[in-house]
Design a protein with these regions (language model features):
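N-terminal active-site segment of His-dependent metallophosphoesterases
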Residues: 1-48, 56-74, 79, 138-141, ...
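Active-site glycine-centered loops adjacent to acidic/histidine catalytic or metal-binding residues
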Residues: 9, 33, 53, 81, ...
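Pre-active-site segment of Zn-dependent metallo-hydrolases
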Residues: 13-16, 79, 84-98
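Conserved beta-sheet core of the metallophosphoesterase superfamily
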Residues: 49, 88-151, 155
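Short histidine/acidic/glycine/proline-rich micro-motifs that form metal-
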Residues: 56-57, 83-86, 131-133
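Residue-level recognition of conserved beta-strand positions in structured domain cores
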Residues: 72, 81-82, 147, 156-157
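Beta-hairpin (beta-strand-turn-beta-strand) motif
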Residues: 75, 82-84, 110-111
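Short, solvent-exposed aromatic-acidic interface loops
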Residues: 154-163
Length: 163
């Protein structure tokens, strides 16, 4: 079993609540738009996986990929910043998501927390919303969940305060 702390769209701001809520996590996953210094602080705290977002600079784009496909506890995961969601996948992922669907598809960008199951492709979609102060969202959010033998469980949406 592995416990994951998932966040996105920090835009250079990392709320101290992230460290409290993710204290018992084994890994942190960031779905892009880190902004300055966020990746370093997260990587010092826990093992970090992530993708760059549309506001991330060249340094971040050399450190993190645009798309990250990997396996965690026998769960096929695909993470990208601009990916859309079931029924409205982004053009750059649409073809592959239907031909080689992951069991878990993670995206950010919209600043809207969303957890949806796509029964057409037997895949869970998660967008953790935005954990930073920049953007139009009103509440900063995180997602925390566990993976055991290819299954997601104990998923929680966490509100960490107003923007």
């Amino acid at each position: 079993m592995i416990t994951i702390g998932l966040l996105s769209d920090t835009h250079g701001f990392l709320d101290d609540a992230v460290f409290k809520h993710f204290a018992d996590c084994d890994e942190i996953w960031h779905a892009g738009d880190f902004g300055p210094d966020v990746a370093e602080r997260l990587a010092e705290f826990k093992p970090l996986r992530g993708v760059y977002g549309n506001i991330d600079d060249q340094k971040m784009r050399t450190q993190f990929p645009e798309h990250l496909r990997f396996s965690s506890e026998n769960l096929d995961v695909w993470m990208t910043h601009i990916g859309g969601y079931p029924g409205k996948y982004a053009p750059q992922v649409k073809s592959e998501i239907y031909t080689k669907p992951p069991k878990l598809f993670i995206s950010g960008h919209s600043h809207i927390l969303k957890v949806m199951y796509d029964k057409k492709i037997d895949s869970m979609h998660i967008n953790p919303g935005a954990a930073g102060n920049s953007g139009w969202h009103r509440v900063k959010t995180l997602i925390k969940f566990c993976i055991t033998d290819g299954k997601i469980h104990n998923l929680a949406a966490i509100e960490i305060g107003n923007r």
